[in-house]
């Protein structure tokens, strides 16, 4: 198995993986979608009653939205994630919640103001802050305030969508186009759309050895004189993350996770 990365940023990756079967490619796709752990807020405690600021002014902690709606919004906010944390049900604390499996947050703000994701303060793990500080949560009116504490734990998208790291996970076969110059008159225009590194040409034919990196080869799918070959052992993937993990961390975890699962399967079959 060989992996070749085409594009890489913190939140996006496109790559080619060679030497796997279609079923293994689909297993990687499914792992990227629903088997990558991330932090998400699971428990929220609201302080109800009067709240006083440093000057003794009194504010009402009642919110314009139901507590359940605010808690739901908090759960969907992407948080920076540390994969060294334990799943709570696998932690040495027995699921009670500790610094090895639980991250504590708080919000303390008075109105009139808009409460944003940037107002979420990480208490136990200062680096594990919201990815985007500008996500709106709730709007406070005059004499309104919010005071909450929240706990975030690791989970996967198999349990709930709030633990889904990736979006737009897709793949396709590696394609090669062989174009007959006599039957396809616009071959020269298509040639200009591709880098020289993916071109192979003689007097009668031109071959595009890789459609990745070319600017729109869709016309070749409907034209005479074009032979398309697909390699079912080479796949081009692309996906995005919500920023809780980098794209590189996400792919690395997915590949290691697959190797572990296949290893367990082989051991079970050998028994």
Curated annotation (Swiss-Prot):
Gene3D superfamilies: 3.30.70.3110, DNA-directed RNA polymerase, insert domain, RNA polymerase, RBP11-like subunit. It catalyses: RNA(n) + a ribonucleoside 5'-triphosphate = RNA(n+1) + diphosphate. Keywords: Cytoplasm, DNA-directed RNA polymerase, Nucleotidyltransferase, Transcription, Transferase. One of its GO terms (cellular component) is cytoplasm. GO terms for biological process: DNA-templated transcription. It comes from the Archaea. Its main location: cytoplasm. GO terms for molecular function: DNA binding; DNA-directed RNA polymerase activity; protein dimerization activity. Its EC number is 2.7.7.6. It is found in: Cytoplasm. InterPro entries: DNA-dir_RNA_pol_insert, DNA-dir_RNA_pol_RpoA/D/Rpb3, RBP11-like, RNAP_Rpo3/Rpb3/RPAC1, RNApol_insert_sf, Rpo3/RPB3_RNA_Pol_subunit. Pfam families: RNA_pol_A_bac, RNA_pol_L. The keyword RNA-binding does not apply. SMART domains: RPOLD. NCBIfam families: PRK00783.1. Part of the RNA polymerase complex. This is DNA-directed RNA polymerase subunit Rpo3. The gene is rpo3.
């Amino acid at each position: 198995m060989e992996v070749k990365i085409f594009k890489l940023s913190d939140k996006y990756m496109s790559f080619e993986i060679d030497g796997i079967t279609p079923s293994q490619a689909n297993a990687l796709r499914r792992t990227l979608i629903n088997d990558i752990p991330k932090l998400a807020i699971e428990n929220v405690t609201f302080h109800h009653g009067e709240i006083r600021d440093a000057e003794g002014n009194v504010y009402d902690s009642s919110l314009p939205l139901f507590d359940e709606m605010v808690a739901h919004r908090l759960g969907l906010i992407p948080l920076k994630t540390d994969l060294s944390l334990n799943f709570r049900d696998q932690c040495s604390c027995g699921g009670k919640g500790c610094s090895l499996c639980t991250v504590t947050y708080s919000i303390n703000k008075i109105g009139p103001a808009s409460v944003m994701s940037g107002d979420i303060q990480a208490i136990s793990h200062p680096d594990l802050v919201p990815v985007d500080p500008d996500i709106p949560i709730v709007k406070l009116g005059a004499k309104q305030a919010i005071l909450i504490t929240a706990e975030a734990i690791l989970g996967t998208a198999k349990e709930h969508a709030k633990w889904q790291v990736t979006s737009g996970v897709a793949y396709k076969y590696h394609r090669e186009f062989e174009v007959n110059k006599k039957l396809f008159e616009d071959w020269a225009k298509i040639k200009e759309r591709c880098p020289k590194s993916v071109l192979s040409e003689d007097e009668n034919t031109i071959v595009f050895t890789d459609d990745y990196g070319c600017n729109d080869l869709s016309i070749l799918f409907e034209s005479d004189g074009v032979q398309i070959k697909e390699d079912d052992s080479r796949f081009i993937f692309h996906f995005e993350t919500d920023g809780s993990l980098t794209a590189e961390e996400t792919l690395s975890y997915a590949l290691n996770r697959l190797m572990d699962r296949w290893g367990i399967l082989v051991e079970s079959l050998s028994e």
